[in-house]
UniProtKB/Swiss-Prot annotation:
<dbReference type="InterPro" id="IPR050162">
    <property type="entry name" value="MsrA_MetSO_reductase"/>
</dbReference>
<dbReference type="GO" id="GO:0008113">
    <property type="term" value="F:peptide-methionine (S)-S-oxide reductase activity"/>
</dbReference>
<comment type="function">
    <text>Has an important function as a repair enzyme for proteins that have been inactivated by oxidation. Catalyzes the reversible oxidation-reduction of methionine sulfoxide in proteins to methionine.</text>
</comment>
<keyword id="KW-0511">Multifunctional enzyme</keyword>
<dbReference type="InterPro" id="IPR013766">
    <property type="entry name" value="Thioredoxin_domain"/>
</dbReference>
<keyword id="KW-0249">Electron transport</keyword>
<dbReference type="Pfam" id="PF01641">
    <property type="entry name" value="SelR"/>
</dbReference>
<dbReference type="Pfam" id="PF01625">
    <property type="entry name" value="PMSR"/>
</dbReference>
<feature type="active site" description="Nucleophile">
    <location>
        <position position="495"/>
    </location>
</feature>
<dbReference type="GO" id="GO:0005737">
    <property type="term" value="C:cytoplasm"/>
</dbReference>
<dbReference type="InterPro" id="IPR036509">
    <property type="entry name" value="Met_Sox_Rdtase_MsrA_sf"/>
</dbReference>
<comment type="similarity">
    <text>In the N-terminal section; belongs to the thioredoxin family.</text>
</comment>
<dbReference type="GO" id="GO:0036456">
    <property type="term" value="F:L-methionine-(S)-S-oxide reductase activity"/>
</dbReference>
<feature type="disulfide bond">
    <location>
        <begin position="440"/>
        <end position="495"/>
    </location>
</feature>
<dbReference type="InterPro" id="IPR002579">
    <property type="entry name" value="Met_Sox_Rdtase_MsrB_dom"/>
</dbReference>
<feature type="domain" description="MsrB">
    <location>
        <begin position="383"/>
        <end position="506"/>
    </location>
</feature>
<keyword id="KW-0560">Oxidoreductase</keyword>
Amino acid sequence: MKHRTFFSLCAKFGCLLALGACSPKIVDAGAATVPHTLSTLKTADNRPASVYLKKDKPTLIKFWASWCPLCLSELGQTEKWAQDAKFSSANLITVASPGFLHEKKDGDFQKWYAGLNYPKLPVVTDNGGTIAQSLNISVYPSWALIGKDSDVQRIVKGSINEAQALALIRDPNADLGSLKHSFYKPDTQKKDSKIMNTRTIYLAGGCFWGLEAYFQRIDGVVDAVSGYANGNTKNPSYEDVSYRHTGHAETVKVTYDADKLSLDDILQYFFRVVDPTSLNKQGNDTGTQYRSGVYYTDPAEKAVIAAALKREQQKYQLPLVVENEPLKNFYDAEEYHQDYLIKNPNGYCHIDIRKADEPLPGKTKTAPQGKGFDAATYKKPSDAELKRTLTEEQYQVTQNSATEYAFSHEYDHLFKPGIYVDVVSGEPLFSSADKYDSGCGWPSFTRPIDAKSVTEHDDFSYNMRRTEVRSHAADSHLGHVFPDGPRDKGGLRYCINGASLKFIPLEQMDAAGYGALKGKVK
């Protein structure tokens, strides 16, 4: 999935080692003791966990961590679920694991969580992560469903929405994929639309988490998907590939804009982050599934790949062991593997993702565009008027600095040409030309239309230090800005609540009084 974004810890530190392996082991025998272990623990406010565990109900457990931004954004949502009558047929609790998988130590976690305000959220602390380890939890957030008879019925790795959670409680085997959020997609059937000239190549270079994240950062790459290629069985699982010798290689399907990048460009980026002389091993990962290879679907590409390999060989004394073969088969990896380092910025990564930001020899970056408008024109209505005209969510977000749920707003995946204005005052804030899919769950921009249209403030909520972004004219809370955006566009990610914005389509800008800004829209 295409999310050209941050991986802030990965980018800053060259990728941190989480567990020293690309993916988890199979759930171990200790999983059978989960219900008993859970009942002996206490919550963050020192209440017995057994208070939340009714014996005649299944138990839905959410595993999360203080360092996981997606987890933090979902705390309020999970608290509401825990109080919602729709969830009354199950015990709904959350588990934090101090001292495990980079979580804070127990005392530090307790002190940190005491500074938050989720009084009705059941947070059980499992010091050392005994339960998480027995269930092989290595992705945050993750969910576990424990049946009435104390059996582990299902593990779900990644975020789930309300419909998925309820379906899981009703049926442990429910098809959760059919209940994903659906988002607006641009109309590609318009006569004036341009069809992108895309090509696809399949690259194997060790653990696919890092390789997928690396290519997602490269300008001109449209999509990067983790999967299993050139094996001997159909529809393999991770466990099949890792433990049952299926012959597949962990591979990333890279789709790129051929008008921006050539296959040779892609291969140059590829060779930057793999050791082409290492047989069945990249980073800390060893096995035939971690072999290196370039798999093509167009026979004409074999010669291009061969030429690139010949050029690369000149850099090494040892022979290259990179496969140059036609693609025999490719199967998407499980959902929790997709965009893994977006979901888990602390996750294992065997390559230096920062190399994606280094232009290839002879390549240049786009120069920034000009800016400018008078923000003093826009006024903030009275509070009474705002309560009358705004929705409850819009009011709470803009006036009380609330945060909408991740992936909940239609603007997150809206990419029509136009501008985004302050829903309170109408002040122009952001352009579709600067919008990108960061994968964080909120509309993301590389810059405002004009730097003077927003103000920045220190924000110490969640016991963290972040930079809040507010509108200039109406002082509306918009979101936050982070230094993990696309490097070639300034390196900033303005992470903005959709509820703070109003979208003005390009074709309506003249009528709405924003015609002078049409040049800011692509």
